[in-house]
Every structure is written in structure tokens, then in C-alpha cells.
């Protein structure tokens, strides 16, 4: 089972539980304050997930480390590739 399938199953399960509670399919008579909170719950969850994602990306960007060894290796590979292409007749 792929990660996408797991997420889709989870969303379907949560969505069907939300729909069953809000539409009264289970026969439960929820108090009015609970129903007031239940209706906008998907929007709250979506906004919360977006805030979490934004915070995670911001934290990862703020704590990003420079990879000087990898940069030197990549630059040497670029020089090597340019020399190989120049030998084959490509001009820069």
C-alpha cells in the first residue's frame, strides 16, 4: 500500500465519520454546541495542517546547513563535464 493510498483511506475514514456525525446518520442527538464545532471542523483541520507545513518548511530553511564538501565535488564535476564537452567540440 503506497503512502498516497494510506492518506486517502485515512481521509475517507475521517470524512465518513464527520459526515455521519453531522448528518445524524448514527442516530445520535448531539448537543448544539458540539454541532456548532463539528460543522467547520474540516476547515480548521485544513488550516492547521497548512500552518504546520509552513512552520516545518520555515524551520528547515532556517536551520539549513551548507554542504561545502558536496559543493566542491559538484564544481569539480562541472569542470570535468565542460572539459569533456569541449573535447567533443562544444563551445561555451
Swiss-Prot record:
Mind naming one GO cellular-component term on file for this protein?
dolichol-phosphate-mannose synthase complex
Q: Which GO terms describe its biological process?
A: dolichol metabolic process; GPI anchor biosynthetic process; protein glycosylation; regulation of protein stability
Q: Pathway, according to UniProt?
A: Protein modification; protein glycosylation
Sorted alphabetically, the keyword list is: Endoplasmic reticulum, Membrane, Transmembrane, Transmembrane helix
State which residue ranges cross the membrane.
Answer: 8-28, 37-57
**Endoplasmic reticulum among the record's keywords?**
yes
Q: What is its main location?
A: endoplasmic reticulum
- Subcellular location(s) of the protein: Endoplasmic reticulum membrane
The annotated topology with respect to the bilayer is:
Multi-pass membrane protein
Q: How does it assemble?
A: Component of the dolichol-phosphate mannose (DPM) synthase complex composed of DPM1, DPM2 and DPM3; within the complex, associates with DPM1 via its C-terminal domain and with DPM2 via its N-terminal portion. This interaction stabilizes DPM1 protein.
What this chain does, per the entry, is described as:
Stabilizer subunit of the dolichol-phosphate mannose (DPM) synthase complex; tethers catalytic subunit DPM1 to the endoplasmic reticulum.
Question: Hey, which family's this protein in?
Answer: Belongs to the DPM3 family.
- Tell me what this protein is called: Dolichol-phosphate mannosyltransferase subunit 3
Organism of this sequence? Mus musculus (Mouse)
Organism lineage = Eukaryota, Metazoa, Chordata, Craniata, Vertebrata
Amino acid at each position: 500500500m503506497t503512502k498516497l493510498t494510506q492518506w486517502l483511506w485515512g481521509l475517507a475514514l475521517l470524512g465518513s465519520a464527520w459526515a455521519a456525525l453531522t448528518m445524524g446518520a448514527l442516530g445520535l442527538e448531539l448537543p448544539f454546541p458540539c454541532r456548532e464545532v463539528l460543522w467547520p471542523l474540516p476547515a480548521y483541520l485544513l488550516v492547521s495542517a497548512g500552518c504546520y507545513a509552513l512552520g516545518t518548511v520555515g524551520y528547515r530553511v532556517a536551520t539549513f546547513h551548507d554542504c561545502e564538501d558536496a559543493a566542491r565535488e559538484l564544481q569539480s564535476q562541472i569542470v570535468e563535464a565542460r572539459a569533456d564537452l569541449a573535447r567533443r567540440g562544444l563551445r561555451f
